[in-house]
UniProtKB/Swiss-Prot annotation:
UDP-N-acetyl-alpha-D-glucosamine binds at residues 25, 83, 88-89, 110-112, 147, 165, 238, 348, 366, 381, 392. The keyword Ribonucleoprotein does not apply. This is Bifunctional protein GlmU. It comes from Polaromonas naphthalenivorans (strain CJ2). The active site is at residue 378. InterPro entries: Bifunctional_GlmU, GlmU-like, GlmU_C_LbH, Hexapep, MobA-like_NTP_Trfase, Nucleotide-diphossugar_trans, Trimer_LpxA-like_sf. Residues 262-473 are annotated as: N-acetyltransferase.
Length: 473
């Protein structure tokens, strides 16, 4: 089989009226990423020479989103062409012709069909082999709305003669169950010739890309069909209902992959991954957990129910108790080996927990580093802080890190004990082994090993009587 350069053309011009949204259809998200991003990643996996995205409705928004792309397609060469006005699929591909060299194969994909697998497309390209028109097809129980594959005979191996759009099909043609998926591979030199012959003599007065099949037959070029059985691979998104249905398919398949790798999921139907999740051996994930962005879970990590974890690395043996929210955003969050977090804890960007750190219920940590064995077990805030080993941080204590204009750091050295309900006003340093008495407001550095108490002196008034309410008040 000869090797031909591959150019991928992606249809992304449609408005998506049934989505009932101002957002261009191809930018709606599945698995936390735009539909179009999934298609671009697939193109990158095929080692395409370039991807040409045909835009129309919301073109500037689509192009801007592509410019911010990450993942497998980050290094893919990308070009954009506009389809204005939108006069059909054939007209759309005509707009791409000026940037398609004749030495290659053109693979036509849809920007709203996110679950097509690279292996499926590789098989389709092998059928094309630089000299045939190859179509990706599927047999459906209810083919309404799809273009039908018309063959020269009734045998499944019979030569493909035409694709007839549903609105133009006769009753006999509508009885055909094999449909065209919208995906084809065609030698570019032939595509250019056939697109020049298109007309809009049909019910919709549009230029159909599918009409090139009859031109191929007329020219004696073989038209082959690669038929698959997995409908999800060619399922498009045209409504919020279809998007939700496809989201469930995506999540179920991802859950199956995780379990095949050894991850224990309490309920595969109650897992949402909206990015990239990697897991070590013997990871356990309870129900209703959401993973966003890039998340890695080390060996033996346990995630309790109802946790939301985004852009975080959680090391081996750590336990994240239920209802914990971890959001690394751009700075990321690091949780060390054997650490315990939650329940009802919040780790914000820049939180870096060392090994065996304990963060308990209703504790918030932001842009702070906690060394091995440090503990903040309940009702506390640590922001812009550096916390040493074995520090005990009392309930109700906070770092006052913001002066209204700038953030300042608090340094708490090793073996410090911070009593309950303390305020550490940054910038401030608490020396190693020091103790801060409960209820203190600390505004100056505390020497190592010292006891520091910064609060009003307690006064007790003997025989004091509470005020008595006046009648009728």
């Amino acid at each position: 089989m000869a090797i031909h350069p591959l150019d991928v053309v992606i249809m992304a011009a449609g408005k998506g009226t049934r989505m009932k949204s101002s957002l261009p259809k191809v930018l709606h998200r599945l698995g936390g990423r735009a539909l179009l991003a999934h298609v671009l990643d697939c193109a990158a996996q095929l080692s395409a020479r370039q991807a040409v995205v045909i835009t129309g409705h919301g073109a500037m928004e689509v192009e801007a989103a592509c410019a911010r792309r990450t993942g497998a397609s980050a290094d893919l060469s990308l070009k954009f062409v506009r389809q204005e006005p939108q006069l059909g699929t054939g007209h759309a591909v005509q707009q791409a012709l000026p940037v398609l060299p004749d030495d290659g194969i053109t693979l036509v994909l849809s920007g709203d069909v996110p679950l097509t697998q690279a292996a499926t497309l590789q098989a389709l390209l092998a059928q094309c082999d630089g000299q045939r028109l190859a179509l990706l097809t599927l047999s459906m129980a209810d083919p309404a709305g799809y273009g039908r594959i018309v063959r020269a005979g009734t045998q499944a191996s019979a030569q493909v003669r035409a694709i007839v759009e549903h609105k133009d099909a006769s009753e006999a043609e509508r009885a055909i169950h094999e449909i065209y998926s919208g995906i084809m591979a065609v030698p570019t030199r032939l595509l250019r010739r056939w697109l020049a012959r298109l007309d809009n003599d049909n019910v919709q007065n549009e230029y159909y890309l599918t009409d090139i099949v009859k031109f191929a037959v007329a020219d004696g070029v073989a038209v082959v069909a690669h038929q698959i059985t997995d409908a999800a691979q060619v399922a498009g998104v045209n409504s919020p209902v279809q998007l939700a249905e496809l989201e469930r398919v995506y999540q179920q398949r991802l859950a199956t992959t995780l379990m095949e790798q050894g991850v224990r999921l309490a309920d595969p139907a109650r897992l949402d991954v909206r990015g990239q999740l990697t897991c070590g051996q013997d990871v356990e994930i309870d129900v209703n957990c959401v993973f966003d962005g890039r998340v890695s879970l080390g060996q033996g990590v346990r995630i309790g129910a109802n946790c939301v974890i985004a852009n975080a690395a959680i090391a081996a043996g750590a336990v994240i108790h239920p209802f914990t929210h971890i959001d690394g955003e751009k700075l990321g969050v690091q949780v060390g080996e054997g650490a315990m977090v939650g329940p009802f804890a919040r780790l914000r960007p820049g939180a870096n927990l060392g090994a065996e750190v304990h963060i308990g219920n209703f504790v918030e940590v932001k842009n702070s580093t906690l060394a091995r064995g440090a503990k903040a077990n309940h009702l506390a805030y640590l922001g812009d802080a550096t916390v040493g080993e074995r520090v005990n941080y009392g309930a109700g204590s906070i770092t006052a890190n913001y002066d209204g204009a700038n953030k300042h750091r608090t340094v708490i050295e090793a073996d410090v004990h911070i009593g309950s309900n303390c305020v550490l006003v940054a910038p401030v340093t608490i020396g190693a082994g020091a103790t801060v008495g409960g209820g203190s407001t600390i505004t100056r550095d505390v020497p190592a090993g010292a006891l520091s108490v910064g609060r009003g002196r307690q006064v007790s008034i003997a025989n004091w009587a509470r005020p008595v309410k006046k009648p009728g008040v």
